[in-house]
Structures are given as structure tokens and as C-alpha cells.
Curated annotation (Swiss-Prot):
Catalyzes the attachment of glutamate to tRNA(Glu) in a two-step reaction: glutamate is first activated by ATP to form Glu-AMP and then transferred to the acceptor end of tRNA(Glu). The keyword Nucleus does not apply. It comes from the Bacteria. Coiled coil: none annotated. This is Glutamate--tRNA ligase. Monomer. Its EC number is 6.1.1.17. It is an enzyme of class 6 (ligase). Belongs to the class-I aminoacyl-tRNA synthetase family. Glutamate--tRNA ligase type 1 subfamily. Its main location: cytoplasm. A motif ('HIGH' region) lies at residues 30-40.
């Protein structure tokens, strides 16, 4: 409610009563104008975590009142991306619910009803100013060093303006296009308590007479969101700090309509390492960008959760499941300062998840990728074997510490599935000597006759082979790695050879001996 102190500059203060007994309800309300921004994912996540921790409802509402910016299929993609991240809405345009419709374009009659109510109560008025007139007025105010605001040319006489009601009615009767503006009270202060930022106050002198209904019959964001937030019974509005300047308009609308506003929490901005606002010009900002690159939902959710939320003094944990985040999240631990978006931290988190993810979960991701590759390229290995769970589990356990994304179990480790087509040139120059071919040729029968082709047996046989020759194990280890994988790096050689199997290893040694030649001195 508003409280006035009776002075010449009234202090109209918005106060809130405790919402005793109300079920906590939060919402994520994106516009269907494209893909989901990582900042939007964080907003959705914090709304989800807060609602779930309080045994409440997390709702997705689509704010599509700006039809000119609407992108086909955007709303479905937004919701599917949230579900991919594990943020399943309790209510949405796709899931339904008791407070629908959840598309604002399907709620136009509702907005019209409340617009008429504001007009009748003297809190709103019709404005017939053209875009040219508005721009001319804006430029004039800028030249005068003033903050651009509507000049209230069409404010009726009985509301403190100079326009006769008869002139307004004449325009309406003639069907002249108009917008509906809210009448902001003069000389008032609008105050509210932000959960994150504490008390914030606005002077009405800085508030424009906001357009509520556009000439096309669609509401503006400000009007529709207030109406819907009330009718859908949201208890907490958690959104980005870019919406802070809109707060006085929203609170005034609540007052005009006689409604109790929800509680608000405005999240800090996401920043680039140079502390500029995160934007498309400086890198990937859509969640879909990161999905395409191979990041998992768990890592991205974990990452954005830490962008602004402080786990608490003395807490060094950085890897959280969605359930753990739900149990620990608190709006009171969200900071005010902007949060730095560092890709290195996301990469680190992705690796932590890969290290600990069950092999069967990884197989579900990489098997379709492998099958797709097998359709494009021929393999000399048995397709049934290399696509089997046992083989893939062995590859995963060997490569967990070495890959950054799940798909790299196939791309980075392709030698487990396909013959090397080339050999790392620098490695050959460094590790291939005039004696290498003869050593490999002599070692081949040892490999072929081993009773057990295991990592331990291969290691023992290799060391036993080089010892009488006065050679170090490296004389064979490096050439064997090159011919088997084509590269100079990888997991334990002996375990790699065991997984590949005797037949593949022998074949690759023979091929390498035939193909690799010493570089010209």
C-alpha cells in the first residue's frame, strides 16, 4: 500500500504484508525471440531452485506480446532447453496448468478488462501522439538536457492535463489509433524491499507515463506481466537487474489495481572477464551454443548456479548435482555485484562430470555418434565388438581423464575404432630410429605367441624383450604407440593395446613398418 506523510513532497511508500499460508510460486517468463541466453538459464534455474526448495511451483510463461519479434518454434525450443537442463516446469504452454493460458497472446481479453478498469478509475488515459511527434519531443528534451519523457499532451483536463475530454472522445469516435498510458502520480516516492539488494526508492519525477496498451490491442510487457503475475498467484519474482528501472511502474500498477505485490529479487548481471556485459559480440551467449559444443546439462547448470550465488563461508565444494543445489540454494546468498563468466571454469566442471559419470550414461551419448561415423568410414575392427558395451566401457575408463567432452570419446580417441590414416610427423622424427623396424619385426612374434594379451603381460614381455639388448623400454613404447594410434600421446600404452586386441595391434604394427619411413637427414 501507499503511505503519505502529508508534506509537500508526499512519501508514497509501497509496503508488503507477509504472505502467510501461500504456496510459493515462481515463474520464468521469456520472450520467444530466439534461443535461450545463459543469463536466462540462470534466471530460470534460480526460480526453479527457490520454488523447489520451498516445495512450491516453477512455472514457464511465454511473453509474446511483441509479435514483430516473435520467432517460429522459439517457445518450444525454450522449454525443451530448460527440460534438457533438468528444469522441468510444473506449468507451461506445453504442460498446461490451472492458471493458463500461459501464452500472453492468448490472454488479450484479460488485459483489455484491466485496462478499462484503469481508464475508468483515472489511472490511465488515451494518447494519440504519432511516432513523429514523440520523436520530435524526445529530441527537444535532449537538447534541453532533460531526461526524455512523454509531454502529456493528451492527458485529460480532469486528470491534471490540458486536453478536453471532448477532443479525446472525438478521436476515439473517428477510430484514430491510440495507445493507453498510465498516469504516474506527481511528487511521490515509490519504495520496495528487494530480497537481494535491500530497500530501493524511486522518485516519480524519473518515471514516464508508461504505455500499457499498444494501438494494435496488445499490452506492453510492463502491463501484461503485472496482470499475469497477480492472476497466476506468483509469490516471488526473481529476474535480472536490468528490470530494476521498471519496478516503480510495476508497483504503481499494483497500487492502482488494489493488489498486493509479490516479493522481488533482482539478480546481478553476467559479465565478460573484462567486466563488460556478456553479449553475443564477445562470444557464445545462448545455451544452444554450448549444447552444440558438447557441454552437458549438469555442467552448465552447475556453472550458472555459481554465477552470483555464494555457497557460504568455508564451503569449498564446487561440483553440485541439481538436487544438492535445490537443498542448499538461498536468495540471501546471491550477491549484488556482477558475476564473471569464465569459460575455463565451465570446462573444468565438464571434466569433473565426465570423470564421475556412469559409463552407461556416456555410452548412451557416444554410441549414436560412433554408429554415425561407422556409416561414413570403414573400420577393420569388428563393428559388433567396438559398439558393444564392454568395449566402450573399456575405452571410457581409459580416456576419462583425457577428454573434455563426451563426443571426444569418439573423435579424440578415434584410433580405438578406426585404423590410423596418418602418423604424427614430429613423433616419427623424434622416436623412429634406423633400428625401429627391426625391433618391431623381432617383437611381433612375442606378441603373437603370448598366452594372455593383457596389459600386465604385454608390459612384462616388452621389458623382458629389451633388457638383454641393453635398451630402455622407451625404445619400443614410443614406436608401438605411434603405429597403434597414430599419435604420441594417450592413455597407458599397455592398457590401450589390451583394449585394441592382439589382431588389431599386430596388423597396425605391420602397416606402420611398411608405411613409416625415416625422415631425410
Amino acid at each position: 500500500m501507499f503511505l503519505t506523510d502529508g508534506s509537500s513532497l508526499n512519501s508514497l511508500t509501497m509496503t508488503r504484508r507477509m504472505m502467510v499460508g501461500k504456496r510459493v510460486r515462481t515463474r520464468f517468463a521469456p520472450s520467444p525471440t530466439g534461443y535461450l541466453h545463459v543469463g536466462g538459464l540462470r534466471t530460470a534455474l534460480y526460480n526453479y531452485l527457490f520454488a523447489k526448495r520451498m516445495d512450491g511451483d516453477f512455472v514457464v510463461r511465454i511473453e509474446d506480446t511483441d509479435q514483430s519479434r516473435k520467432v517460429a518454434d522459439a517457445q518450444e525450443n525454450l522449454i525443451k532447453t530448460l527440460e534438457w537442463a533438468g528444469l522441468m516446469p510444473d506449468e507451461s504452454p506445453l504442460h498446461g496448468g490451472d492458471f493458463g493460458p500461459y501464452l500472453q497472446s492468448e490472454r488479450l481479453d484479460i488485459y483489455k478488462k484491466y485496462c478499462e478498469q484503469l481508464l475508468e478509475a483515472g489511472h490511465a488515459y488515451h494518447c494519440f501522439a504519432t511516432s513523429e511527434e514523440l520523436e520530435e519531443n524526445r529530441q527537444l528534451q535532449l537538447k534541453q538536457g532533460l531526461q526524455p519523457k512523454y509531454n502529456r499532451k493528451w492527458l485529460p483536463e480532469d486528470m491534471g492535463g490540458s486536453m478536453p475530454r471532448s477532443e479525446i472522445q472525438k478521436k476515439l469516435d473517428e477510430g484514430v489509433p491510440s495507445v493507453v498510458r498510465m498516469k504516474v502520480p506527481d511528487y511521490v516516492s515509490v519504495w520496495f524491499e528487494d530480497i537481494i539488494r535491500g530497500p530501493i526508492e524511486f522518485d516519480s519525477a524519473t518515471i514516464d507515463d508508461q504505455v500499457l496498451m499498444k494501438s494494435d490491442g496488445f499490452p506492453t510487457y510492463h502491463f501484461a506481466s503485472v496482470i499475469d503475475d497477480h492472476l497466476m498467484e506468483f509469490t516471488h519474482i526473481i529476474r535480472g537487474e536490468e528490470w530494476l528501472p521498471s519496478m516503480p511502474k510495476h508497483l504503481l500498477l499494483y497500487e492502482f489495481l488494489g493488489w498486493e505485490p509479490p516479493k522481488y529479487a533482482h539478480l546481478p548481471l553476467l559479465l565478460n572477464p573484462d567486466r563488460s556485459k556478456l553479449s553475443k559480440r564477445q562470444g557464445d551467449v545462448s545455451v544452444e551454443d554450448y549444447i552444440r559444443k558438447g557441454y552437458s546439462g549438469e555442467a552448465i547448470v552447475n556453472f550458472v548456479a555459481l554465477l552470483g550465488w555464494n555457497q557460504g563461508e568455508g564451503c569449498e565444494q564446487e561440483v553440485y548435482s541439481l538436487q544438492e543445489l535445490t537443498e542448499r540454494f538461498s536468495l540471501e546468498r546471491v550477491g549484488k555485484a556482477g558475476s564473471i563468466f569464465t569459460i575455463d571454469k565451465l570446462n573444468w566442471l565438464e571434466k569433473q562430470y565426465i570423470k564421475n559419470r556412469p559409463a552407461e550414461d556416456i555410452i548412451r551419448v557416444i554410441k549414436p555418434l560412433l554408429l554415425s561415423e561407422l556409416e561414413k568410414k570403414e573400420t577393420l575392427l569388428d563393428p559388433a565388438t567396438i559398439t558393444g558395451e564392454r568395449y566402450l566401457e573399456d575405452v571410457i575408463e581409459l580416456m576419462r581423464e583425457r577428454v573434455g567432452f563426451e563426443r571426444e570419446f569418439v573423435t579424440f580417441s578415434s584410433y580405438f575404432f578406426f585404423e590410423p590414416e596418418t602418423y604424427e610427423e614430429d613423433a616419427v622424427k623424434k622416436r623412429w630410429t634406423p633400428d625401429t623396424n627391426s625391433l618391431l619385426d623381432e617383437f611381433l612374434p612375442v606378441l603373437e605367441s603370448m598366452p594372455d594379451f593383457t596389459a600386465e603381460a604385454i608390459e612384462a614381455a616388452l621389458k623382458e624383450f629389451v633388457a638383454p639388448k641393453g635398451l630402455k623400454a622407451a625404445a619400443l613404447i614410443h614406436p608401438l604407440r605411434i603405429v597403434s594410434s597414430g599419435v604420441s600421446f594417450g592413455p597407458s600404452l599397455y592398457h590401450m593395446l589390451e583394449v585394441l586386441g592382439r589382431e588389431a595391434v599386430v596388423r597396425r604394427i605391420r602397416k606402420g613398418m611398411a608405411v613409416i619411413t625415416l625422415p631425410q637427414q
